[in-house]
């Protein structure tokens, strides 16, 4: 039996059946619901109608008629409105295509992942192809990737419009010829002025191709030539432009002393020079003059086997403003050469003496006494360095990065000296065979350490790595 409800409407029945209680339909249109017999809401509870909905007071909302409560259309309001009439709802794009959200989201993906995500839809591609997402990245294009093979067997140069849309300012071309470079210049819309850095690796570029490239691509200020054996020193004389500020030449068999003469005379604004050439001698370094002394701040002489202390003399007198110097692999440089560096290049912040087998602890004493601004020191494979040398380095309050890979005479006692270097952020001890677990465990005192490399260290045990994870939680330990 039913009883009258609100405003005389009949109240629906509420009868238990098979342990279920059927609730009356709600005016919100959600339909009936049921509660199982075992739930606290229905157990030992009399069958009651749902409580009437609580409505806001008249001062906060306009009263609704029975027609409105029943879901029917509202009649037009009579009298003055109690508040401003809301406008139509603002339509927002779906979250998956909301550019504001996507602009923040895509920062969390790597370059490779961005390339894949750009294929999802046009909206994602439009957002991802903004140059800000690709700043600092350099596309690497191999010769075979520059052409599409047509059905007839002919080759067609690929469309580079996608690279132009992303605003790439540098490219690395691998295995290309003079013709490939000309095609690249003709087909990339930003090649004339927009490209600032070019790298050619293992390519057959000739003197003529190098000259055409630098003449056509007027924006290039950073140039790298690696493994290019078909250009000669004459090509450097005919093509190098004064606008170039960074030059790297490595594994190019025709590069010798005369190439340095061309570089020193044609590049007055050169700020960074990296040279890896087995045939360069001390004579080449004599070509540097005070003209480069004002602009050049970085010099890397990599595996220049013929350079001796005499060449170092020319460097320190001609380039007094160097802040970064690498003599890596210059195997004829001795402690006397390092003394010249320490006494004359007081602005150095980075010094690389790796693979210099004649360097001893005495060289480290010169470094510690005179290079008070030094922040990075690389001593990999300096096999004559001992604990005594590390005791000299422990006085350097500015040193932040120290590399001692494969320094086979360093022992636990030397590590104790390093524990006083609170400024250290990066320490590499990879391949040091005499370090024990006990000696390495003391490194937990360097609480500011951010990176510790211990690959190929016999004393680096799983238990030690667990110990580091507990006591150096902010440090990346490379096993």
Swiss-Prot record:
The LRR repeats are at 244-266, 267-290, 319-343, 345-369, 371-395, 396-420, 446-470
- A Pfam family assignment: LRR_6
Keyword Ribosomal protein assigned to the entry: answer is no
Q: Which residues form a coiled coil?
A: none
One Gene Ontology term from the biological process aspect of the record? SCF-dependent proteasomal ubiquitin-dependent protein catabolic process
Q: Which SUPFAM superfamilies match?
A: F-box domain, RNI-like
Query: Pro residues bias: where?
Result: 47-60, 73-92
PANTHER family, sorted? MITOCHONDRIAL ATP SYNTHASE COUPLING FACTOR B (PTHR13382)
Task: Specify the protein name.
Answer: F-box/LRR-repeat protein 16
This protein's species is Rattus norvegicus (Rat)
Organism placement in taxonomy? Eukaryota, Metazoa, Chordata, Craniata, Vertebrata
């Amino acid at each position: 039996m039913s009883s009258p409800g609100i405003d005389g409407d009949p109240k629906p029945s509420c009868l238990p059946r098979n342990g279920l209680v059927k609730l009356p339909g709600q005016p919100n249109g959600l339909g009936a619901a049921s509660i199982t017999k075992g739930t606290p809401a229905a157990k030992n509870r009399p069958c009651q109608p749902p409580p009437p909905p609580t409505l806001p007071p008249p001062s906060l909302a306009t009263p609704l008629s029975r027609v409105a409560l029943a879901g029917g259309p509202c009649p037009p309001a009579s009298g003055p409105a109690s508040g401003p009439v809301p406008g139509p709802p603002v339509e927002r794009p779906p979250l998956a295509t909301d550019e504001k959200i996507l602009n923040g989201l895509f920062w969390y993906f790597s370059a490779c992942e961005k390339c894949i995500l750009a294929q999802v839809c046009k909206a994602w591609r439009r957002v991802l192809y903004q140059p800000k997402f690709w700043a600092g990245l350099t596309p690497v294009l191999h010769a075979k990737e520059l052409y599409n093979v047509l059905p007839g067997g002919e080759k067609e140069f690929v469309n580079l419009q996608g690279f132009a849309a992303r605003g790439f300012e540098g490219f690395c071309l691998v295995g290309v010829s003079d013709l490939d470079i000309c095609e690249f210049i003709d087909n990339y819309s930003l090649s004339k002025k927009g490209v600032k850095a070019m790298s050619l690796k293992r390519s057959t570029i000739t003197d003529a191709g190098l000259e055409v490239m630098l003449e056509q691509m007027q924006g290039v200020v950073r140039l790298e030539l690696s493994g290019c054996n078909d250009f000669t020193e004459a090509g450097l004389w005919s093509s190098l432009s004064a606008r170039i500020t960074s030059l790297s030449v490595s594994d190019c068999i025709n590069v010798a002393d005369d190439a340095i003469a061309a570089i020193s005379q044609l590049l007055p604004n050169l700020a960074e020079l990296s040279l890896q050439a087995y045939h360069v001698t001390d004579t080449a370094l004599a070509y540097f003059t005070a003209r480069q002394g004002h602009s050049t701040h970085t010099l890397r002489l990599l595996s220049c086997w013929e350079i001796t202390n005499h060449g170092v003399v020319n460097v320190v007198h001609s380039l007094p403003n160097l802040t970064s110097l690498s003599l890596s692999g210059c195997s004829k440089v001795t402690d006397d050469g390092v003394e010249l560096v320490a006494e004359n290049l007081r602005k150095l912040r980075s010094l690389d003496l790796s693979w210099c087998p004649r360097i001893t602890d005495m060289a480290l004493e010169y470094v510690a006494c005179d290079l008070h601004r030094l922040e990075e020191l690389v001593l990999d494979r300096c096999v004559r360095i001992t604990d005594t040398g590390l005791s000299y380095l422990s006085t350097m309050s500015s040193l932040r990065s120290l590399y001692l890979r494969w320094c086979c005479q360093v022992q636990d006692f030397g590590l104790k000296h390093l524990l006083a270097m609170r400024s250290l952020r990066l320490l590499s001890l990879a391949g040091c065979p005499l370090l024990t677990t006990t000696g390495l465990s003391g490194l937990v005192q360097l609480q500011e350490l951010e990176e510790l490399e211990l690959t190929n260290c016999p004393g680096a045990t799983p238990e030690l790595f667990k110990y580091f994870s507990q006591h150096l939680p902010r440090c990346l330990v490379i096993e």
